[in-house]
Amino acid sequence: MPDSSQVQPAAFNCQGGLVLNRSSFLMEPGQARELENFEPDIQGGYRRISGYSKFINQVVPITSSTAEEPLMSALFANKVLAARGEKIFSSASTELSIRITASTTLSGSGILTVASTSGFSSSGTIQIDSEKFTYTGISTNSFTGVTRATSSTTAALHSKLSVISEDWTVRDTGRTGAKKYHFERFNFDGNEKIILVDQVNAPVVFNSSIAATDVSESSVAGATVVAAYRNHMFYAGKSTIPQEVIFSEPFNEDGFSSGAGAGSVKVDDTVVALKVFRNSLFIFCETRIFKLTGSSLSDFVVEPVTRNIGCINSFTVQEFAGDLIFLGPDGLRTVAATARIGDTELGTISKNIQSIFDENIKDAVEFDSVVIPDKTQYRIFFNKAGQASSISKGATCVLKKEGFEFSELKGLKTTCTDTFVERGDVIVLHGDVTGFVQRQESGSTFDGSTILGKYRSPDMAFGDSGIRKHMQKVIINYRPEGVIDTDLFVRYDNEDKNSARPAVYPFDTTNLPSAYGSALYSTTSSTTQFAYGGGQDPLDRKSVEGSGFSIILRVEDDGVSNPYSLKGFQLEYQLGARR
C-alpha cells in the first residue's frame, strides 16, 4: 500500500566530530555539539572509547617522597622502563593463556602458560591481579616451578588474558632532582639502545641488557630533549644554554670531539623540542621553528620554518599520519611537507574545538600526548595541578578522508606516555598519579572506574526553524562490541526548559551478533546472548514523543557499557503548524 502517513524521514551518518565554533544553522546533522569519551571511528561513526588497565600490576616504587609521580614509562628490549623520584626501574609484562581457578594447586612444581616470557628474569616473583607467585624457571611460553599465594597473598580466580608482571628492578640511581623524561630509541652500531634525559642530570643510555651508562660530556648534562639524526645524537634545552643544540660524533652518542664530527648550532630562541621528520631535524622553540638539514658537521644547515609560531610544550610533539603535530599558542598545528621539495606548510587544525584549547592551555601545568597509529589518532592530555583524575580532560584528533575530526576526553590524568608497535601490536602506555603504568585501549573501564560517554547532536531544524515537527520515531544504527547499557534522550527547541522533555528511552543490548568459530557459546541463562548470523550494525527503532521546532538527540551511557559505535540515525516526524 502507498504510504499515506505523511511521515517525513531524515537520516544522517555520524561524521564530522565535535564542532564548537559554528552555529546550529551551519552545523551538519552528523556533527556533534558534545562528544565526550567517544572517538571518531575510522570505520565510520563515533565509538565510545576503550578503557585502560594495569600493564604492570606492581606500583612503581617510591624513592624518597610520597609526592613522587612516575616521570617516564617506556617499552624497550621486552621490558618496561619507568622512572620515579631518583631511580629508574624495569619490569616485564605478559598475559595468562589459560584460566586459573582459586582451587588450582600450584605448590612448587606448577606451570603457568602465558603469551610470552620475553623480558622476564629466569626466576623470581610475578603477580596476577593482587596474588603473588614465585617461579624457578621459564620456557618460551611458560613459567615453571610455580608456587602460588606467596608473600601472604590469597589464591584467587584469574581469567584468561589476565596481566602477569614481575617485580620492579632498580636499574639506575642517584638521579637527584630528576624531572619528566624524554627518550629516544636508536641503533648506531647494530645494538638496540635507548637514551634518556631528565632535564637535570647526565643523559643515560641503556643497552638491550638494561645496563646503564651515563653520557660523560658535561655540556649535555641537564638536557631536556634528545633526538637521533643522521647517526648523530642531538641534545638541547639545557637551562644554561637554552638556544644551543649540541650534537655528538657520528655513531657515538658519548663522543664530542669536533675533529671527529661533533659540534653545535645556535638559534635565536629557547629550544623546546627536537623531532626528526623525513630528511630534516625540526627544532621547535618558544616562538619560532627551525629545521636542520644535511648529513654531517661539514654540511649541517639551519633555516627558519617560521619566526611567528612556536611550540608550547615538548611532550605534545608527535609524528602523526605522515606529519608532525604539536601544540602551538592557538591550538594544534601540523608541519606538513608540500609537493614542492624543501617547502613547508604550517596549518592550524583544531579550530573546530578552539574553545577547549583556550580553556586548557592557560591552566594546564603539564601536557602529554600519544599516537594510536592503527586508529590514525592523536591524543593530548591537559594535566592541571590538584585536579582529580575523574575530571581531568584531553582531546582526540583523528585523520579521516574528509579531514581532521575531534572529540573530548574526560577521566584520564597522565604523568608520562609512550606508544610502541611490537609485531603489529600497538601498545599505548601512560603513568598515572597513583604510581602505576597503565595500558590504554584495554578493557571497558578506567582501571575499574566507570567511563561516562556523552554524545549530543546539533539542534536540527531540517531546513526550516519555523515549522513544528511532531516526532514519531528515532532509528539508531550502531555497532556493539559487547553488552551495552545506554540511554537515548530526545529534546526540543534548543533544550528550552518550557519545551517537551520526554522520559529517557533505554538503549541497550544483550543480544550480540557472532560468527561461527570466533564467538563463545551462550545459554538461555547467559547475560549475553550470541546470535549466529546476526547483523554487525543493527537498527534499534524507538517510538518517541514530543514536538518542537528543532530536535536534539543525546546518548549517555552509565559507565558500565562495553565500547560501541554510533553509526547514524533516522528521525521520522510529521510537519505541524508554522510559528
Where on the chain are the PLM-derived regions?
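A short beta-strand motif characteristic of beta-propeller blades
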Residues: 55-64, 168-174, 211-216, 259-264, ...
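Small/polar beta-strand repeat architecture
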Residues: 96-110, 115-179
